[in-house]
Design a protein with these regions (language model features):
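Phosphate-group recognition and catalysis centered on beta-loop-alpha active-site segments
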Residues: 1-130
Length: 130
């Protein structure tokens, strides 16, 4: 396939900009559903990162530790999704979203870029879960 045909098949929204970790600011925490909705509302593609929780579920967060975005220590791979949902909130008060919640929110409205975050060699389990 020629380069021109490949480019022609790409969604034009991909070229308008990609909101890194959503379209966030001092009132919307990065990688939160409200930051992703803000990107969607502005017709921007967005990028996010996913980690594998202890129970095999996928959580959206850039860092492997929840401290920077929640203010509370916690290694994602050592916690279950239930523990995270019960005990952690993003700095703006929002829940830390799961991969499934991000997919449901976007519902194919804009293109997304997802980075799989490997922790201590868990790449096979992470790839299977994703």
């Amino acid at each position: 396939m020629s380069k021109n045909k490949i480019v022609a098949k790409l969604n034009p929204m991909f070229f308008s900009g990609i909101a890194h970790r959503g379209l966030w600011n001092d009132q919307l925490t990065e990688n939160g559903l409200r930051a992703f909705q803000n990107a969607i509302d502005h017709h921007l593609s967005f990028e996010y990162d996913i980690h594998l929780c202890k129970d095999g579920q996928l959580l959206v967060c850039h860092d492997d530790n929840l401290k920077r975005t929640t203010g509370k220590e916690g290694i994602i791979e050592e916690l279950t999704m239930e523990e995270i949902k019960k005990n952690y909130r993003l700095l703006d008060g929002e829940e830390v979203p799961s991969f499934a919640e991000v997919l449901a929110l976007n519902h194919e409205q804009v293109p997304m870029v997802c980075e799989l975050k490997v922790h201590e060699g868990n790449y096979k389990a992470l790839a299977r879960a994703a």
